[in-house]
A protein has these predicted regions:
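Glycine-/acidic-rich phosphate or pyrophosphate-binding loops and their flanking alpha/beta elements
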Residues: 66-71, 243, 282-305, 318-322
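Terminal amphipathic helices with adjacent charged low-complexity linkers/tails
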Residues: 226-256, 348-355, 360-369, 373-374, ...
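Conformationally flexible catalytic loops at phosphate/diphosphate-handling active centers
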Residues: 220-297
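Thiamine diphosphate
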Residues: 27-28, 41-186, 193, 395-396, ...
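Iron-sulfur cluster-binding cysteine motifs and their immediate structural context
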Residues: 1, 8-27
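Conserved thiamine diphosphate
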Residues: 174-228, 414
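Peripheral docking tails and interdomain loops at the edges
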Residues: 361-414
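Redox- and metal-dependent alpha/beta enzyme cores, enriched for Fe-S-associated oxidoreductases
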Residues: 294, 300-330, 334, 340-346
Length: 414
């Protein structure tokens, strides 16, 4: 077997040039190994993409599914045949369904010894160009963020469904939104970002999971789905899509066939200038991701009071909008479907007639922080007054509470 010419041995060698004689005038940081040793010695062909196939599905009646189950079905329809995870409540139901469905589909379900092991298995599987995923919940997701940083640094795709629960620490298994800061601003060490999708119904759990795989491979980057404990267990009507995906193999994949064997995936850049250039590339990719901003606007065309909420609290906020409208208060709901990148362009469109923003969330202001940061980064100076209705620890804002305090012009923090 010939050397595939990846160059990793040169980059990682503890001596500047290994067993080769070092040129007298060599400066290690500035030396190009290609100039020293010539062209890469490999007979491997240039990698070739094996494209995805879209398989039409027969029309069928809607199903009634839990949110976690809907996400699992969405993953299968998106072509995911590899699952790595460690069971943790309230996300375990999704993994349990994958354990039943993957073997008959010739897929791989592997319960790892820990979340740390699971994310590194995803690194290897995603690096081979395979669609892979995990279900986890807040403490488990915390254990995965080191591996997520490695995946981002190596441009390895994967889908992480974080069914958020109460914290910090062991907390409880009730729903909370206190991982928003973690998924938007804390995906491990270094310069990391990932698209974060926030569903609010079982139907969106399926739809956004399918979308997550497409985005993960479009950008060669992990994608996070930020669900919560109620949404994972909530049942609802779920319609199946018109087609499913039979995935191929990307040209960059470290795959065992002849057409891909010269590929290498790594996040090692020993020269500072090389790592800086790689971070510039990542920043350009993060900037390109901003076109993926998504939001759902409900009665926002003439809204003077704009409720901002996501996941399960957005359902209470939607009911509050209806009740406030019945009282003659022109309220609307702005629901960010992408928490990162925050859908600031869609928000800016409704700000001219907005007099007050009320952020409804089950956390200590983490959604409001994303809102304020997006407004600041977009140089929006004429910002309406921002208030909030907040609860923590698994307690959710209630519709009647939102209505009463919006009508009174007050904010609530427990």
């Amino acid at each position: 077997e010939h050397c595939n010419g990846c160059g990793l041995c040169i980059a990682a060698c503890p001596e500047p040039y290994g067993l080769q004689e070092t040129p007298a005038d060599a400066e290690y940081e500035l030396q190009d190994p290609g100039k020293l040793f010539g062209d890469r010695m490999t007979d491997a062909p240039e990698p070739v993409e094996i494209p995805n196939e879209i398989v039409p599905l027969q029309k069928m009646e809607p199903l009634v599914l839990k949110g976690n189950y809907a996400a699992a079905v969405g993953a299968l329809l998106a072509g995911c045949r590899h699952f790595f995870g460690y069971p943790i409540t309230p996300s375990a139901g999704g993994g349990a369904l994958m354990a039943k469905l993957l073997p008959p589909l010739e897929g791989m379900f592997l319960q790892a010894v820990s979340e740390v092991a699971a994310v590194n298995m995803m690194y290897g599987c995603g690096g081979a160009g395979m669609r892979c995923m995990t279900f986890t919940s807040s403490p488990g997701f915390s254990l995965m963020v080191e591996g997520i940083s490695y995946m981002i640094g190596s441009e390895v795709p994967g889908v992480f469904i974080n069914v958020m629960r109460g914290g910090p620490g062991l907390g409880n298994i009730a729903p909370e939104q206190a991982d928003i800061k973690l998924v938007c601003r804390g995906l491990g060490h270094g310069n990391t970002h990932a698209i974060v999708l926030a569903p609010s119904t079982p139907q969106e759990m399926l739809d956004l999971t399918m979308l997550a795989f497409d985005l993960a491979f479009k950008y060669r980057n992990p994608v996070v789905i930020a669900s919560d404990g109620y949404l994972g267990q909530m049942t609802g009507k779920v319609s199946m899509p018109a087609s499913m995906v039979k995935p191929g193999i990307p040209e960059w994949a470290v795959w065992g066939d002849k057409d891909h064997r010269r590929n290498l995936i790594s996040s090692i850049y020993l020269a500072e200038t090389d790592l800086e250039a790689w971070n510039v590339h990542l920043n350009e990719k993060y900037e390109a991701m901003k076109v993926e901003q998504r939001a759902d606007l409900y009665m926002c065309d003439d809204a003077e009071v704009l409720l901002v909420a996501c996941t399960t609290p957005s359902r209470m906020a939607k009911g509050a909008v209806q009740a406030l409208r019945a009282q003659g208060i022109r309220a609307g709901l702005f629901r960010p479907v992408t928490l990162w990148p925050f859908p600031i362009e869609k928000l800016k469109a409704v700000l001219p007639h907005t007099k007050r923003i009320v952020v409804v969330e089950a956390s200590n202001g983490q959604l409001e922080d994303e809102l304020r940061l997006a407004l600041a980064n977009a140089s929006v100076h004429d910002v309406p007054e921002i208030q909030h209705v907040r609860h923590f620890g698994g307690v959710l804002p209630q519709m009647a509470e939102i209505v009463a305090n919006v009508a009174a012009g007050q904010e609530v923090t427990v």
